């Protein structure tokens, strides 16, 4: 009798993806983040579904409904804080996953990489719309500021913004449509993640050396299923520590004040995971220029396969590129810090220098250093 795992049309797909999948024997813990992102997505969809059962997307009752969830619903506070902090864990895993891809040259898998960038945009859009739903001060003003950026688009800008708002300001119509989109997008993200995985399994995983590993493959189960389980446990430990001990650590106190269109908060800023892009946006004095820089700061990831000049795939054996990569990481930390600071001296200048450095490293220095390394190795 043949094994049902290998013959059943549906189980066979699962088998080829998670059980008998040949994986390189030398992949490190940096390869755990894909499965951790899948775990985060499931947590977000489940907690989000339970929150949606009690939430009302009306400007008059949205804030009260979130309060009701936290006070009156059984374990509502836990579900709400798991959902809010789950987004932070999601982005931590995302940034590490993308960073791994950049360091080890995983972007040479064009389709997998480009779908990954689309996924990043989709997750950012979902997180932004989710932040608007509690209808606190930062929700309202964040939505106003970010949607207003579209008015920088020549000719159609103002019309486009009013179309998105469903009126002449962020109001009931905006909240309702944001709730609808925030609900549907995670399922689109799940579908995209499956396509992401499909393309990855066409080529097989990359590995730290960047060399072809066809001669040295091991089955995913039990080796990497056990390794991923350890990753899950560490993630759950950090995640639940955050949720149960300091649930508001990464949030903004202003969001505990109900939205008031007549009172602007002193410092409007997004959640921490958008601060680097927000800093780039603010560092350009021109509105359209800032919006373009904001979009391009993420879209630039799609250029990495084109900008790859090295004869080697991974940075494992390229110390000069490694050095530049870690300067880029430090620069992103600097941008994140600047994004949360008020717009005044010296933060403006630091932000501008950090923004210029970000684009310079990616577009100019990394390709040049790669060419230099080729020369040094006489390739």
UniProtKB/Swiss-Prot annotation:
CDD domains for the chain: cytochrome_b_C, Cytochrome_b_N
Subunit details: The cytochrome bc1 complex contains 11 subunits: 3 respiratory subunits (MT-CYB, CYC1 and UQCRFS1), 2 core proteins (UQCRC1 and UQCRC2) and 6 low-molecular weight proteins (UQCRH/QCR6, UQCRB/QCR7, UQCRQ/QCR8, UQCR10/QCR9, UQCR11/QCR10 and a cleavage product of UQCRFS1). This cytochrome bc1 complex then forms a dimer.
Keywords annotated in UniProt: Electron transport, Heme, Iron, Membrane, Metal-binding, Mitochondrion, Mitochondrion inner membrane, Respiratory chain, Transmembrane, Transmembrane helix, Transport, Ubiquinone
Record-listed heme b b566 binding positions: 97, 196
InterPro entries membership: Cyt_b/b6_C (IPR005798), Cyt_b/b6_C_sf (IPR036150), Cyt_b/b6_N (IPR005797), Cytb/b6-like_sf (IPR027387), Cytochrome_b (IPR030689), Cytochrome_b_C_euk/bac (IPR048260), Cytochrome_b_N_euk/bac (IPR048259), Di-haem_cyt_TM (IPR016174)
Predominant location: mitochondrion
Cofactor: heme b
GO CC, alphabetical: mitochondrial inner membrane; respiratory chain complex III
Miscellaneous information on this protein: Heme 1 (or BL or b562) is low-potential and absorbs at about 562 nm, and heme 2 (or BH or b566) is high-potential and absorbs at about 566 nm.
Entries under Pfam families matching the protein: Cytochrom_B_C, Cytochrome_B
Cofactor binding note: Binds 2 heme b groups non-covalently.
Binding site for a ubiquinone: 201
Family: Belongs to the cytochrome b family.
Transmembrane regions listed in the UniProt entry: 33-53, 77-98, 113-133, 178-198, 226-246, 288-308, 320-340, 347-367
Protein name from the UniProt record: Cytochrome b
